[in-house]
Amino acid sequence: MILVARRQDRLAELRHDLQEQHPNLAVQIWQVDLADPAQLQELTEWFDRENLNVDLLINNAGLGDSGPFATSDPIRNEQMTLVNVVALTSLTRHVLPQMIAKRRGGILNISSSAGFLPVPGSAVYAATKGYVTSFSEALRAELHGTGVSVCALCPGPVRTEFQQVAKRPDGRPEIGPEFVLVPLEQVVRDAIKGLEADKPIVIPGFAMKLVMLLARLTPMPLLRLLLRRYSSRDSAESH
């Protein structure tokens, strides 16, 4: 198992926990900031050089932010695009040929329910997740019959460290409505089941599935009106 993340301390802690539970599991860790193109290139070159036999790629790294786009941090926007889009695409490209060659493999891309709709206040984040979902669907079609499966995990709000990092402009954590919140453990279980069942899209939680169904059935003019009202209300609450 190879673990890649920014924080060495968290990587070491996770490796320790995994090896305590699975003593025979070999775990290798790489401290990489995927928002840094040079570090991403170093990682992909290592992948190529070592000719790694990857059976499952989980593209889990992600960045988010909240607030009006006009006052957003350009550097943060670029970092979101680099991590959520560029790194995911690059890593997938580097492991895919050998998966196809051995006619087996799995790719789990962590997208978001935000990727199905434009989200005022999270314009860049939602757009990057829209890319992930579309990319996953297209790749899945290309790989039909190769033995390689592709699944996009599209959760709604989940209680994780992500919400503490992706804060609103007023400093509040970015946590969604209580009724759609799903425990992290359920998200993991649903992701594994979805990948094993070769599902194209996995949306954990009944409430979030219902919300997404209603959103898809809503006529676009009405949806635009609702999005404008949501944006106005959210802006008023943050002042």
Regions found by a protein language model. Name each.
Residues 8-9, 31-42, 74:
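The beta1-alpha1 cofactor-binding region of Rossmann-like NAD(H)/NADP(H)-dependent oxidoreductases
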Residues 112:
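Residue(s) in the substrate-gating loop at a strand-loop-helix junction
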Residues 1-13:
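Conserved glycine-rich Rossmann-like NAD(P)H-binding loop of the short-chain dehydrogenase/reductase
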